Amino acid sequence: MTASSRLRFDIEDAPSDADVEVLPNGLEAFNESKWPGHQQWRPLAVFARDGESIVAGLAGETYSGWLFIRYLWVSDALRGRRIGRKLMGDAEARALERGCHSAWVDTFSFQAPGFYPKLGYEVFGELDYPPGHRRIFFRKHLEAKAGAQVYASE
């Protein structure tokens, strides 16, 4: 270990990719030592297409029993037609098939903060970000619907 008296602290506005890459590599090595297999992320996407065009969709990942919804988008022309609800339901069903017990998503106050509670999501955190708005974090415990078959494969 380098003696602390010889450490130099550099503040950089344009760090190299190689220098920045040292950080997640070190963190991942530490995390793996405490939580083996934590990096077993599986992509999950649901798309609504009109012909060859994607007009709505959801993209996220499942890992360690959780579904993370990274993106949910419905084109302006289709909003209000329950397309988002269908995308979320399909993703949650697949997450259950993969053995997930919960889901989480975040949105901004100018996007769809009223949508997720209608689907059973509850707020677990908020940030005053970006200025003049809020970033809101939601979670939900997933439960299989009556009569649905669920296979734990993750």
Task: Report residues per predicted region.
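Conserved active-site tyrosine of GNAT-family acetyltransferases
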Residues: 23, 116, 121
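Acetyl-CoA-dependent GNAT
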Residues: 7-70, 75, 110, 125, ...
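Conserved short alpha-helix immediately C-terminal to the canonical SAM/SAH-binding motif I
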Residues: 87, 111-112
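Conserved GNAT acetyl-CoA-binding A-motif
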Residues: 95-109
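Conserved catalytic-core motifs of GNAT/GCN5-like acyltransferases
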Residues: 104-106, 122-139
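Conserved acetyl-CoA-binding loop-helix of GNAT-fold acetyltransferases
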Residues: 80-93, 118
